[in-house]
Amino acid sequence: MASIDGLPPLREVIRAHGLSAKKQLGQNFLLDLNLTAKIARLAGDLTNSDVLEVGPGPGGLTRGLLAEGARRVLAIEKDARCLPALAEVAAAWPGRLEVLNADALEVDLAARLTPPIRIVANLPYNVGTELLTRWLSSDWPPFWESLTLMFQKEVAERIVAKPGSKAYGRLALLSQWRTDPKIVLTLPPEAFTPPPSIHSAVVHFTRLEAPRHPADPKVLARVTAMAFNQRRKMLRSSLKGLVPDIETVLREAGIEPTQRAEEIPLEGFCALARRLAG
C-alpha cells in the first residue's frame, strides 16, 4: 500500500503519533494493509460511490478505500488523537477524504454524502450493533446502497443466524428482513493491535429494494424486542402486554401461543406485526 499512496506502514504511523487503542472507545486497530485493501474490495466497485467510514483510527481501511478508487470518503472519528494521522492520508489523496471529529451516533450522516453511498467500516465494538440497528431501521429504501461492516464474530453469526439456533434473535430478523447479509471474511485476533480476545468477521449487507415481507417497522421492532427480551418464555407470556387477547392475535398470525421467539421465522413475526397494526 505504501507504494500506492506514499505513506508509511501503519505501525510506523501509530508509533509516530503515539497512538494506542482505547478499550473504552471499543478500538482495535487493523494494521495489515493487505487486509484493509481486501475489505475495501469486498465492498464492491467503489469508483462511483461516496463511502462512509466510522471509526477509521489511524486510517488503514481509509487508505484501502481510497486506493480501491472510492470517489470520496467521509471518515467519522470520535478520537481526536487520530486526526493528525488521518490528515496525512487526506494530504496524500487531495480532495477525496473528509474527516469529521464527531460521534457517529449524533451526526446526520446522509446529509454529508452524495448517492450512491456505501458504508464500509471496522466498527468500534461498543457502538457497532447500535449503528447497524439504526441503519436497518431507517426509512426504506435507505440512504445507503450496501454495508460492509466488521464485528465481533459472535455478532456476525447473530446477524446471519436462522430460526431454532442459539444465535437467532432480533438482530437476525432486522438484518434479514431488509437486506441479504453474508459473512465474507473472518479475521483472527492477531490481525489487530491490541489483539482482542475473540475473532472478528466482516459482513456484507446487500439492501433489498423492498422488505421480504410487509410489516410496519415500528410495530415489528417493538414485537421482536419484547419477544427476544424473554426468548425462553412462551410468546403468550412474553407478549401479553401488547393487547388484551394476545393468544387470539398470535393464532390469527399463524403462530401457536406456546411457541417461543427463537422458533418463529421472519415471515411469522411480520405476519404478527401486520395483525397488531391492523
From Swiss-Prot:
Any one cellular-component term (Gene Ontology): cytosol
NCBIfam families, per the entry: ksgA
Keywords: Cytoplasm, Methyltransferase, RNA-binding, rRNA processing, S-adenosyl-L-methionine, Transferase
Catalyzed reactions: adenosine(1518)/adenosine(1519) in 16S rRNA + 4 S-adenosyl-L-methionine = N(6)-dimethyladenosine(1518)/N(6)-dimethyladenosine(1519) in 16S rRNA + 4 S-adenosyl-L-homocysteine + 4 H(+)
UniProt-recorded name of the protein: Ribosomal RNA small subunit methyltransferase A
InterPro entries per the UniProt record, alphabetical: KsgA/Erm, rRNA_Ade_diMease-like_C, rRNA_Ade_Mease_Trfase_CS, rRNA_Ade_methylase_Trfase_N, rRNA_adenine_dimethylase, SAM-dependent_MTases_sf
Binding site for S-adenosyl-L-methionine: 28, 30, 55, 77, 103, 122
Protein encoded by which gene: rsmA
